[in-house]
Swiss-Prot record:
Residues 119-145 are annotated as: Disordered. Residues 123-133 have a biased composition (Basic and acidic residues). This is Uncharacterized protein ECU09_1820.
Length: 232
């Protein structure tokens, strides 16, 4: 079995992207079983939500960041803007980056949901100790979307078989839910909209890495990728 065939097997077994499967294949040095385990740990990456909101995806857990008028809540720890060192966190978010160490992240993937509440002040029941300054995140900054464009995923199943004999699989983030979609290679993104619009009474847009995917595009272009569905 050649490398490309193993990559295909990895993608089928884990539902990961081609890039993740290729990296797992390289790391495993041709060991298919090991590559599948590696790809299963890595997952896929997608950012969206808030004016600076984001999803970064990893199967094991979900992290959260909420920005308030007076500070930033990272998981259950609040970083008050009255502490000078914490202003850097706001500046990082404005630059579309964040300190991964504050989330306990040491790999290259995780699921993070960012929410903005600029008119609301966070109040703690008990004062938390002041946060110590930590080194800033030096990884890749990503362009982030708008949380007001998030949509509900009520009644949408985990698997949408638009074509039961479809030969193209891709994943869609709908709100906080990840849905697998099966379609024919000959179908377009517009065909996906025709199907999904039965669940909504407003306009929709599909995007990848902050760029809109036109309805005329073939679904083959997003095969094995993770894309975002949001309000137009």
């Amino acid at each position: 079995m050649d490398s490309e065939a193993r990559i295909k097997k990895i993608m089928e077994a884990t539902g990961c992207s081609h890039d993740v499967a290729r990296k797992a294949e390289n790391e495993s040095q041709g060991n298919l079983d090991l590559a599948i385990k590696i790809a299963g740990r890595k997952g896929n990456v997608l950012y969206s939500g808030g004016k600076s909101g984001l999803y970064v995806e990893e199967r094991p857990s979900r992290k959260s960041i909420t920005q308030y008028k007076n500070g930033i809540l990272v998981e259950d720890k609040f970083y008050d803007f009255s502490v000078d060192d914490n202003i850097r966190l706001r500046e990082m978010l404005e630059k579309k980056t964040f300190d991964a160490s504050l989330l306990g992240l040491h790999g290259d993937t995780a699921e993070v949901i960012y929410t903005e509440k600029p008119d609301e002040e966070y109040r703690e029941n008990s004062k938390a100790p002041e946060a110590k300054a930590r080194p800033s995140f030096v990884g890749e900054g990503r362009r982030l979307g708008d949380s007001s464009r998030e949509i509900p995923h009520v009644n949408i199943p985990d698997m949408l078989e638009i074509a039961k004999d479809g030969n193209v699989l891709f994943k869609v983030m709908i709100g906080s839910k990840r849905v697998t979609v099966r379609m024919l290679r000959s179908q377009t993104v517009g065909d996906f909209f025709d199907y999904i619009e039965r669940y909504y009474d407003f306009g929709l847009v599909l995007s990848s890495n902050g760029k809109e995917i036109p309805p005329s595009h073939s679904v083959e272009e997003i095969s094995n990728k993770l894309v975002l569905l949001s309000r137009r």
